[in-house]
Amino acid sequence: MELIINGEKRAVTAATLSQLVEQLGMKADRVAIELNREIVPRDRWPQTPLKDGDQLEIVHFVGGG
């Protein structure tokens, strides 16, 4: 399926947000995800399905000072 992630079209095989985070090689504890303009709590990622054309914004948290 094709998703729009941070403004770019990407083909993915993930069926849920959790699977997408894993497929993209991200650490779940360091990202926040907005799906179709709604922030999805991390505990809902495993049961949040993805559909062709969904728009996601993924924000990475970086530590430092």
Regions found by a protein language model. Give the residues of each.
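Ubiquitin-like/PB1-type beta-grasp interaction modules and other compact soluble beta-rich domains
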Residues: 1-64
